[in-house]
Amino acid sequence: MSMSHLYGTDGEDGVEMENFEVSDWDLQNEFNPHRHRHRQTKEEATYGVWAERDSDEERPSFGGKRSRDYSAPVNFISAGLKKSAAEDVSDEDSDEDEKPVKQEEIPKEFVPKKLKTGGNFKPSQKGFVGGTKSFMDFGSWERHTKGIGQKLLQKMGYVPGRGLGKNAQGIINPIEAKQRKGKGAVGAYGSERTSQSLQDFPVVDSEEEAEEEFQKELSQWRKDPNGGKKKPKYSYKTVEELKAKGRINKQLSTPQKELSQVKVIDMTGREQKVYYSYSQISHKHNIPDDNPQQLLGKDSKPQGFALPELEHNLQLLIDITEQEIIQSDRQLQYERDMVVNLTHEIQKMSEILSHEETAISNLSKVLDMVEECERRMQPSCENPLTLDECAKIFETLQDKYYEEYRMSDRVDLAVAIVYPLMKDYFKNWDPLKDCTYGTEIIAKWKSLLENDQLLSHGGQDLSTDAFHRLMWEIWMPYVRNIVAQWQPRNCGSMVDFLDSWVHIIPVWILDNILDQLIFPKLQKEVENWNPLTDTVPIHSWIHPWLPLMQARLEPLYSPIRNKLANALQKWHPSDSSAKLILQPWKDVFTPGSWEAFMVKNIVPKLGMCLNELIINPHQQHMDAFYWVIDWEGMISVSSLVGLLEKHFFPKWLQVLCSWLSNSPNYEEITKWYLGWKSMFSDQVLAHPSIKDKFNEALDIMNRAVSSSVGGYMQPGARENIAYLTHTERRKDFQYEAMQERREAENMAQRGIGMAASSVPMNFKDLIQTKAEEHNIVFMPVIGKRHEGKQLYTFGRIVIYIDRGVVFVQGEKTWVPTSLQSLIDMAK
């Protein structure tokens, strides 16, 4: 190694100066324990760099005071040709501009060769210089042995040619070793990774990055021996970098609008300056400091060419150019977005334009059709418009031009065209003679003119529904005229007329007809009715209105009952006409009111009739008994049983006892007993009180037979009476068993029906069920509500349901009540 690698010389003065940079020799011998360490001699300590040294051509020895051995062979080190100082300086300058080159990138012919052993090297150094022995033949001794390792691996599942591990994730080839090129430390010659390492672990080694960073920093603190100037380094910014910077920094350099007209006083300089916007401050020149320039030190070099104003202006131009590029990029992006938005707007406007053109075309066609109708509506037209043709035109408008027809004012159009034709169509119409006249044409116009939206919301505004207005202004006057001339007792024609139109006319018009026209006529006729003189029964002209009016007829029932009660004051049960008059009202009146009417007006008359009945076994007159029994279906079973217990059975048992006390014929008594029992229905006989009376008669007969001991007894009388008693008791038992079986079957069917219905029963359904069980009419009142709740009629009582509670209408307020109390009040 030449001394020029350890010491440098000044090109100008020729003074030797020690170069402190790290050389290749230092790196190669970093970890060499036998490296020569220069010991400073006394002369070097005294004179320093001016001490005399051996010739540069002489090679320093590795021993302390060992002299040079000239008998040893000469060893040459491939270190290249020595260049002059100027060439070294130029090379170093050029090297500083270039990036450090890795060891792998240097061609093999330029790499320093290994140092050969011999010469002045010690024996301990020869092994280090020569390198280590190759490991290629390591483990070759196993080829001459039994191969126990390979067999053990195969027993544990190892497959030759595959990696170790459960999933064969191990490496197949053994780890390769790479021999270092020189004597330097680890990493001194670049990366030492093998091709196998790069293949198995392709991650970039952090040591390589650290080496590159070290080389870069090392080149920065090296001192230029000639003091030459380094080449200036320029940093360039591309347009893409400026665009990216502009996208990150969204703050524009231009001032905001509210700050563009702000007056600013600048007092940072020697003089006061006034600016009228913040943007002017950003464009002002930098003012040099007033302080005197600092004196240059010994080591500092004066600037030969320094122009701060020019540098500032250049920097300002650069900044302005950058801002212009950023603003241009933003403007370009804005324009591109604007193009996209305008494209979408054009498409949208094109769709709107086509839609508007279609709408204009459709409106033009609709206008032509309307004008054609107006032309044909003129009196002088040869081909006048008919109602059927007008309906076809409206059907065309509804089918082909539905949107235009829906948006148009159908009320005005119908008033102008349809109403005159409809008046002409019904001008000769008599509703009572031809009740179905015009139903088909009106049903067709209902589908054309009725406003479905108002219908779904329950609206009744005549100004917005053409069909309702048509029926009210054109159809309703004919109905008013005919009802004014109508006689309530001739109800058939009027009922048929309303039945034909009930599904066509609006609900509120039907309510108006029934409440304002029909009901007053019926009420007046009921007031004039006299059941004693009128030959036509009242139910014949009241009951036909029940399907249409239902609960509306409730106010008529009370005066009818009063008139019937007055007519029954002088009635005798022998007159069967009373039953014919009252029987149709049984299902119309509520069960409670009907029972009260019967108990007050009929039952006393029947009791008087039974009191007049004479029971004579030898000559029996049954007319009075038949008159009473004939009312069995009209009065309740309990009322009839009460009459029999009070007015019939005491006399009947008394006659039986008298007959048994006079040596009777038991055969005749048996026939007499069975004959009277056959006069009663099964429902009456099943009553416990009636059973007790007939059983009492059997007991009297048995006692009479048993008490005749020693006297004359009719042969077989005792057996006959016993057989009769047994037979009657068995019939009673069978009847009771049959009743129990029927009740069980009804309960089973009811349970099956309730199980089949998966819909849970609410409180309204419970009330409906109870009403059906007690034969009480339960129905909603049409068009009547209280605080948004639907009103119902439960018999004669008006109720409403709110959160599972029944409220009954009182005199002034609504009173909550229980379900059982409600049923009792309805009865």
Curated annotation (Swiss-Prot):
Q: How does it assemble?
A: Identified in the spliceosome C complex.
Chain intervals for the UniProt region annotation (Disordered): 31-129, 179-203
Compositional bias, Basic and acidic residues, is annotated for 41-60, 99-112
Q: Where in the cell is it found?
A: Nucleus
Taxonomic path: Eukaryota, Metazoa, Chordata, Craniata, Vertebrata
- Explain the purpose of this protein: Involved in pre-mRNA splicing, specifically in spliceosome disassembly during late-stage splicing events.
Query: What keywords does the record list, in alphabetical order?
Result: mRNA processing, mRNA splicing, Nucleus, Spliceosome
Q: Name the gene for this chain.
A: TFIP11
- Superkingdom to which the source organism belongs: Eukaryota
Which GO molecular-function terms appear in the entry?
A: nucleic acid binding
Task: Name the Pfam families for this protein.
Answer: G-patch, GCFC, TIP_N
Q: Where is the G-patch domain?
A: 145-191
* Any one GO BP annotation for this protein: negative regulation of protein-containing complex assembly
> What is the first-listed, main subcellular location in coarse terms?
nucleus
Question: What is one GO cellular-component annotation here?
Answer: nucleolus
Instruction: Point to the regions of Acidic residues compositional bias.
Output: 88-98
- Species assigned in the record: Gallus gallus
Q: Which InterPro entries match?
A: G_patch_dom (IPR000467), GCFC_dom (IPR022783), STIP/TFIP11_N (IPR022159), TFP11 (IPR024933), TFP11/STIP/Ntr1 (IPR045211)
Family, as annotated: Belongs to the TFP11/STIP family.
Q: What is this protein's record name?
A: Tuftelin-interacting protein 11
**Signal sequence bounds:** none
